[in-house]
Amino acid sequence: MKAVSILSMRIKRGSPHIWVESIATRRAGFEPGVRFSVEMHGSGVLLRVAEDGDRRVSRKIRGESITPVIDINSQSDLAPLSGHESARVVFGDRRIFISPLASELRRRRRLVRLQEHLADGYLETSSIATGGGILSHALHAGFQDAGLYAQSKMCNEIRSDLAEHAMVHNDAFDDQTIMANLPLQELAFDDEVVRRLPEVDIVDLGLPCSGASQAGRSKNKIALPEHHSAVGHLIAPAIALLAKLNPVACVMENVTAYADSASAAILRGYLGDMGYEVHERELLGTEWGELEARRRWFLVAVTKGIPFDFDKLQPGEYPERQLSDVMEHVPLDDSSWSAMQYLKDKEVRDVEAGKGFRMQIYDGSERSIATLTKGIAKRRSTDPFFRH
C-alpha cells in the first residue's frame, strides 16, 4: 500500500461519480494516458493498470504541473459504491481499490449479524465496567420479557470480588461468559486477549462515576471528571473496546453530571462517526416503581437504520409502597444500632460553618429514600439512617 485516502462520492447524471485527483495516483502507476480496467472486487471496485483496459487516465494541467485524474461516472462500474457519500481509496502497485468506508462496512456487518441472531431468537451481549452486573441483568431480563434469549460473551470488571460475585449470583452470566477481571485500560490494548473477544449485539457500559459525581469531585478536590487519577481517562479504553466489540447498540448509565463531561462529548462524537444515533434521557427510580430516588443519566446508541424512541419508554402502574415494606426487622437491642453522636456533632459544626451537609433520618413510613451510595457501610454523615 502506497497511500490511502477518503474521497467524496457524488451523483452525476443519475449514476455514482468518483473523481480521483492526487499525486498518489501517479505513485500507483496511473500516469496520464495509461489504460486501466475496472473490476468488481469483494465489497468494492478494483482499478488495475492494463494495456487492454477500456478506460484511460485523464490529466489536469495547472501551469506547468500535470496531475493524473481518474474520472468514473457509471452505475455498473461503481455498483458496490452506490448510495454512499464517501469512499475509501487505497493506492497500491499498479492498482487502486475503492470501497465503502470501514465504518460503513462495520455498520452493515452489525445489521446483518443482528438479523441472523434475531431469526434464531437470541442476542449476544458484553459488559464493560460491569460492577455487580445490575445493568446487565436488567438488559437480559428485558430481552427475556421480549421472548429473546441473551448470551453474555464477556464482562469486564477490575474488582475481583465484584466479578466473582456476579459470576456466582447474577444469572446474566454463565460458563460461556469470558470474565475479563483486569483494568479496562489493560484489556482494551491487550491484543492477545482482545483478538479472542467476539463482536456482539449489545454492550452495556458502566464507567465509574467517582470523578463525575458531586461527592467524588468534592472528595478528590477536582474541577473536571477527567482529572480523577484513577478513572478520569477511562473513556479512551472504553471507546477502543467498543470499536472491537462493534455492537448494534450500546447502553450506558451514570450520574447526571456525566452528561456534561468532556468524556460524554467525546463518546457522542465517536458514536456519531461510527454510524450510531445517540439518544439520552434522565430517569428517576421512583417514577418506575422503585423506593430509591436515584436519578441517573442514560445514553442509548443504536446503529443507524434501527428505530429507537425514548418517548415510547413509559412507566407502568406500580403499587404504592413505603420503606417499612422492604425493611428487615432488627431487634431494638441489636448491636447494629448506634447513637451516632459523632455524626450529630458533625452536623452541628457543619451548620455553624454554613455548610449544607445534613443527616437523613427515616422512620420507615416514607415512600422513597435518597440515593444509596456504594460507601453507605462507612456511615457517612449524609447517607440515609433509620431512627431507633
Residues covered by each model-derived region:
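Core alpha/beta nucleotide-donor-binding catalytic domains of modification enzymes
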Residues: R113-N246, T256-A262
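Beta-strand-rich non-transmembrane domains
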Residues: S8-R13
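Short, well-ordered beta-strand segments enriched in hydrophobic/aromatic residues
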Residues: I18-V20, R281
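Class I S-adenosyl-L-methionine
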Residues: D191-V200, A212-R379, P384-H388
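Short glycine-/small-residue-rich flexible loop motifs, especially phosphate/cofactor-binding loops
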Residues: S22, S136, R268
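Short, well-ordered loop/turn elements at secondary-structure boundaries
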Residues: P32, D120, A150, R294, ...
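C-terminal target-recognition/interaction regions appended to catalytic cores
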Residues: K2-A3, G14-P16, I23-A24, G33-V112, ...
